[in-house]
Amino acid sequence: MDYDMTTNHIKSLIDNNCLDEAIHLLSHRIETNKEDDEAYYLMGNVYRKQGNIKMAMFYYTSATEINAHSPAAEAYRVLLDIRNFINPDYNP
């Protein structure tokens, strides 16, 4: 399966809440290419969709460390704003 088809398939899995399968495919993709910022971004989306904000932020950070222009940078900022709004203790 080529890269674009795999990416589209993973996005479809995420959209359809087939999150375990998406995690499996993304984990394999990250194992085979540690510099795949898109895979880290998509993994962050999976964890965000599961409500695991801590892991989502971890993967978004990983993506932006590889590519500062990744959409993960904006996703991270949005999650940070939400976290600070919900729990003002994080924002002294």
Describe each PLM feature range.
Residues L42, A75-Y76:
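Canonical tetratricopeptide repeat
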Residues K34, N67-A68:
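Short coil turns that delineate tetratricopeptide repeat
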